[in-house]
Amino acid sequence: MGRSFEVRKSSMAKTQGAKIKVYSKYGKEIYMCAKNGGPDPDMNLSLKHLISKAKKDQVPTHIIDKAIDKANGGGGEDYQHARYEGFAPGGASVIVDCLTDNGNRTFQDVRQCFVKTGAKIGSPGTSSHMFDHQAVFQFKGEDEEAVLEALMMQDVDVTDIELEDGVITVFAPNTEFFKVKTALAAEYPDLVVDVEEITFVPQNPMEITGEDAEKFQKFLDLLDDCDDVQQVYHNAELED
């Protein structure tokens, strides 16, 4: 990857309103995952991973259970995945993933985020080719070579592995997610994994400074206010 993986998640919600947005996004995603793959986490590995991720982000159990019960009961909303790509202020590449029950509304909402900040929304494929769709695992450690050897012994396809400041980051094709997860658990039963997700890793990070950085942050804030937006991926590196 040429550099250490940077987790670009927003800081944990500090206000009640922001927490509600986080809960809503997880609730919608868990509902769709359970509806499409079944409500039993032991039979639906994607759901099992999503529940684990939600708990790490401090989503209350009753929110998770409610979403699964809703999916198990049938009916309810029929959400569809929608993806929008383009270039954010300063020219950074961006991918916006949504879950929506009204595609026209969601497109208009996302489009306004681009328009209001001078960003440019494009057609499918506009910016996604500038990212690698990867499974990423991050945990404390000092011997990345031993981890790599252990994964290779389990016949795991590893794209890259990095060590920086006592943190090991493993990259693998997105299709290898559960294979990596299983192999790490088998080789290191007591390992605490801080990050385990499928994400879009930028191939070439872009430094955004000055006025462009301010506009870029406004762009992210506007997207965060859109109820249908689930994830935003970008290659921007902002000044501290």
Swiss-Prot record:
Ranges in coiled-coil conformation: none
GO cellular component: cytosol
Major localization class: cytoplasm
InterPro entries: Integrase-like_N, TACO1_YebC-like_2nd/3rd_dom, TACO1_YebC_N, Transcrip_reg_TACO1-like, Transcrip_reg_TACO1-like_dom3, YebC-like
Residue stretches spanning the membrane: none
A GO BP annotation: regulation of DNA-templated transcription
Signal peptide: none
Subcellular location: Cytoplasm
GO molecular function, one term: DNA binding
Entries under Pfam families matching the protein: TACO1_YebC_N, Transcrip_reg
UniProt keyword terms in alphabetical order: Cytoplasm, DNA-binding, Transcription, Transcription regulation
Family the UniProt entry places it in: Belongs to the TACO1 family.
This protein's name: Probable transcriptional regulatory protein VSAL_II0141
Organism: Aliivibrio salmonicida (strain LFI1238) (Vibrio salmonicida (strain LFI1238))
